[in-house]
From Swiss-Prot:
It comes from the Eukaryota. This is Probable proton-coupled zinc antiporter SLC30A4. Keywords: Antiport, Endosome, Ion transport, Lysosome, Membrane, Metal-binding, Transmembrane, Transmembrane helix, Transport, Zinc, Zinc transport. Residues 135-143, 200-216, 296-310 are lumenal. The lineage of its organism: Eukaryota, Metazoa, Chordata, Craniata, Vertebrata. The gene is SLC30A4. The keyword DNA-binding does not apply. It comes from Bos taurus (Bovine). Its main location: membrane.
Length: 429
């Protein structure tokens, strides 16, 4: 076998020709790796030269193929010929397909990062709860509670990515996006119940001061917490991205670019948000470490433990308030904070042949999936252009303002006639 392979490579080398390879765009080649004829040479790279001047072509093509030179016939582009199924499949928009493939690849990378982060958070959160219980430290357990909020946020992000691939059903025609909102409400409620219990214990310790804390275990647990959060920061850090601490757009700026509201930015934003949460956990872990150091070497200052519980409980309440507010807005079908209804109406009015925008309703199926229903009236006499107007309005809502879905109703403008209701006439008489 080895001798046969060496003989094939030798024959291939002897067949090489230094003449430049000339091909036209109609030449056919077999790129199959399994060539039946051993006499044919194999190649992994191919250089194609396209020229208008036929004199540049060598008399014998270097690869043994007999290519026929043909002039470009642009008239074929003007002919309206029916396309076969195979041709239709080639006519698919490659940019759209490529963007979907890139989106799937991004989601896989994001899911991998967030899954690793969730596992680390879960393991260390359990370790902190056990260490805090053994050390009798409320500060350690409050830090674990804050870590629970970050773990919930990551799980909700993974849930949203998973639900985005699920198709709607006959009963749930919008899909299962609101399940993310329901999960957020349950997780925040659980966090508040645990926080209330820890605050109650902290108040009891502050009043009675009858407790002992194992400073060694508290110090070791706090030091491990700092190390874990540093690892989380490196894991979630995205080189080349600017890590902003604001997760919302200003209300007077309805958009920041094309398709700003779609999910191709959601992956980086999800990891970025988790990175910011990891920074917050790092600061809190450093605070617990300082308190543990004080209690370890100055046991009489054990009041630092309930004080840390108060401070960190406020931090947990502050970080979860935004989740509660966003959840309430979604449930009440309010307009997302980064969209401006008046600005969108003005943009729709600038479309040619649009007379007025009668109704515009905007809400969110879930976080990052705004939806719109709009009723547009056309200028009288422009009914024949309704497809063009609808296409422009749809492009504006989906691509410019980042709507996840939109429904557009069009009708010709009709001047309202002042008509008096028959009941009103009878009552007035």
């Amino acid at each position: 076998m080895a001798g046969s392979g060496a003989w094939k490579r030798l024959k291939s080398m002897l067949r090489k020709d230094d003449a430049p390879l000339f091909l036209n765009d109609t030449s056919a080649f077999d790129f199959s790796d399994e060539v039946g004829d051993e006499g044919l040479s194999r190649f992994n790279k191919l250089r194609v030269v396209v020229a208008d001047d036929g004199s540049e072509a060598p008399e014998r093509p270097a690869n043994g193929a007999h290519s026929a030179l043909q002039a470009d016939d642009d008239s074929l582009l003007d002919q309206d010929l029916p396309l076969t199924n195979s041709q239709l499949s080639l006519k698919a928009d490659p940019c759209d397909n490529c963007s979907k493939q890139r989106e799937l690849l991004k989601q896989r990378k994001v899911k991998t990062r967030l899954t690793i982060a969730a596992v680390l958070y879960l393991l260390f959160m359990i370790g902190e709860l056990v260490g805090g219980y053994i050390a009798n430290s409320l500060a350690i357990m409050t830090d674990a509670l804050h870590m629970l909020t970050d773990l919930s946020a990551i799980i909700l992000t993974l849930l949203a990515l998973w639900l985005s691939s699920k198709s709607p059903t006959k009963r749930f025609t919008f899909g299962f996006h609101r399940l993310e909102v329901l999960s957020a409400m349950i997780s925040v409620l659980l966090v508040y119940i645990l926080m209330g219990f820890l605050l109650y214990e902290a108040v009891q310790r502050t009043i009675h001061m009858k407790y002992e804390i194992n400073g060694d275990i508290m110090l070791i647990t706090a030091a491990i917490g700092v190390a874990v959060n540093v690892i989380m920061g490196f894991l979630l850090n995205q080189s080349g991205h600017h890590h902003a601490h604001s997760h919302s757009l200003p209300s007077n700026s309805p958009t920041t670019g094309p398709r700003c509201g779609h999910n191709q930015g959601q992956d980086s934003l999800a990891v970025r948000a988790a990175f910011v949460h990891a920074l917050g956990d790092l600061v809190q872990s450093v605070g617990v470490l300082i308190a543990a150091y004080i209690i370890r070497f100055k046991p009489e200052y054990r009041i630092a433990d309930p004080i840390c519980t108060y401070v960190f409980s406020l931090l947990v309440a502050f970080t979860t308030f935004r989740i509660i507010w966003d959840t309430v807005v979604i449930i009440l079908e309010g307009v997302p904070s980064h969209l401006n209804v008046d600005y969108i109406k003005e943009a729709l009015m600038k479309i040619e042949d649009v007379h007025s925008v009668e109704d515009l309703n905007i809400w969110s199926l879930t976080s990052g999936k705004p939806t719109a229903i709009v009723h547009i009236q056309l200028i009288p006499g422009s009914s024949s252009k309704w497809e063009e107007v609808q296409s422009k309005a749809k492009h504006l809502l989906l691509n410019t303002f980042g709507m996840y879905k939109c429904t557009i109703q069009l009708q010709s403008y009709r001047q309202e006639v002042n008509r008096t209701c028959a009941n009103c006439q009878s009552s007035s008489s």
